[in-house]
């Protein structure tokens, strides 16, 4: 069927554009520019705010920066660069450490107030009058909580959190009250953008995801939604996303607990709602639980995936409830995506490869590529 059968309202591309150059996936200099622009300016998800315990500080990565996130004894969150303003030493040496009212540098014992980062003590050093303690506190990092998720931003003047479908998309889910009950991590040998690319199209679905195509039948056609198909019109009837009898992304399609009561009939019928939060995460809201996935760059050719499953307390209180079993379905899909991303990355290393040529169904990849290039422009 020729692309002329594409409806103007369809998201399909009307041409086959080139992708990013090969250097975008392998070159250390390109990667460094991404860290200095995209990941230094955008809000980066680092987990659920409720999962940061009181009187503890945790070391997290935001692009090229190491950041301390802490919650003090009174429950207040704060974030600072993990670098002592004195001579630059790391402050938090482990993934997580106890913290009281002070953060003390392990090198020269300079002490800083945990709540606001003020320099409190220079320990054995005796500064001269030209040293202003008020100008040498910890360097703060902006933080914001959205739907219970904690985001950090390295920019001195951060803008709003960006979400592809808007920040109100999950308003009918009880997001703030959800509890994290399962955690899964995987390191994959590919560039961080390669995983975003496989997330952004379904041409690969028929060959890579048999279980997912069974759960979401339209994926077996190589499209993410009906509007991508040639011949589609806005007058076509809206059909449920999930196979008959399925209500959620679980191995048997059955809800793992009570369906969230605030959802609209359309949200229940859809079975899932994706929220994309470039560059660091996406959230998938089902009728009975929510999954978050963070994409953490580790280098030009290495990426960490961090997935967590969040449930209502009444779901967790069910006798015999097993969050790991609920997570099994999505783990299958993510492992398949990870293996395919690695396969693609290895192939792109070929001397014969220079750049991709995107298909009309890969409109979301094209949009992502344009976003990456625009965000790498120097700040105005």
Annotate each PLM feature.
Residues 46, 52, 91, 119, ...:
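Short clusters of hydrophobic/aromatic residues that line enzyme substrate/ligand-binding pockets
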Residues 8-22, 176:
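Short, contiguous pre-domain boundary segments
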Residues 40-51, 122-127, 274-279:
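Short Pro/Gly-enriched beta-strand edge/turn motifs at strand-loop
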Residues 71, 76, 82, 144, ...:
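C-terminal catalytic domain of Rieske-type non-heme iron oxygenases
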Residues 1-12, 377-380:
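Basic/polar N-terminal segments that are highly enriched at the extreme N-terminus
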Residues 39-43, 89, 204:
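Generic structural signal for secondary-structure transition and capping sites
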Residues 20, 24-63:
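Non-catalytic accessory segments flanking enzyme active sites
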Residues 51-156, 164-165:
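Rieske [2Fe-2S] iron-sulfur-binding domain
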């Amino acid at each position: 069927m020729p692309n002329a059968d594409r409806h103007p309202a369809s998201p399909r591309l009307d041409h086959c554009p080139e992708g990013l150059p090969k250097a975008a996936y392998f070159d250390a200099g390109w990667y460094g520019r991404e860290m200095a622009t995209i990941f230094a300016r955008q809000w980066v998800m680092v987990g659920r705010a409720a999962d940061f315990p009181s009187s503890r500080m945790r070391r997290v990565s935001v692009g090229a920066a190491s950041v301390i996130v802490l919650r003090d004894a009174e429950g207040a969150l704060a974030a600072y660069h993990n670098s002592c303003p004195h001579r630059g030493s790391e402050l938090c040496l482990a993934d997580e450490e106890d913290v009281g009212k002070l953060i003390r540098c392990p090198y020269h014992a300079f002490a800083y107030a945990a709540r606001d980062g003020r320099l409190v003590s220079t320990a054995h050093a005796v500064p001269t009058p030209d040293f202003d303690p008020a100008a040498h506190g910890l360097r703060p990092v902006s933080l914001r909580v959205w739907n219970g998720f904690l985001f950090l931003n390295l920019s001195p003047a951060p803008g709003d959190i960006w979400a592809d479908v808007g920040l109100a998309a999950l308003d009918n889910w009880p997001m703030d009250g959800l509890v994290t009950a399962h955690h899964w991590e995987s390191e994959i040998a590919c560039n961080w953008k390669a995983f975003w690319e496989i997330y952004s199209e379904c041409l690969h679905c028929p060959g890579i995801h048999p279980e997912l195509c069974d759960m979401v039948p339209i994926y077996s056609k190589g499209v993410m939604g009906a509007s991508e198909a040639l011949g589609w019109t806005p007058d076509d009837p809206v059909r449920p996303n999930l196979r008959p009898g399925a209500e959620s992304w679980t191995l048997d399609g059955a809800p793992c607990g009570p369906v969230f009561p605030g959802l609209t009939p359309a949200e229940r019928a859809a079975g899932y709602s994706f929220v994309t939060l470039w560059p660091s995460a996406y959230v998938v809201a089902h009728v009975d639980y929510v999954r978050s996935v963070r994409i953490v760059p580790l280098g030009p050719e290495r990426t960490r995936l961090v997935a967590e499953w969040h449930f209502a307390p009444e779901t967790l209180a069910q006798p015999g409830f097993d969050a790991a079993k609920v997570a099994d379905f999505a783990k299958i899909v993510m492992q398949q995506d990870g293996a395919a991303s690695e396969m693609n990355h290895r192939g792109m290393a070929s001397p014969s490869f220079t750049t991709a040529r995107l298909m009309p169904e890969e409109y979301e990849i094209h949009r992502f590529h344009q976003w990456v290039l625009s965000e790498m422009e120097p700040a105005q």
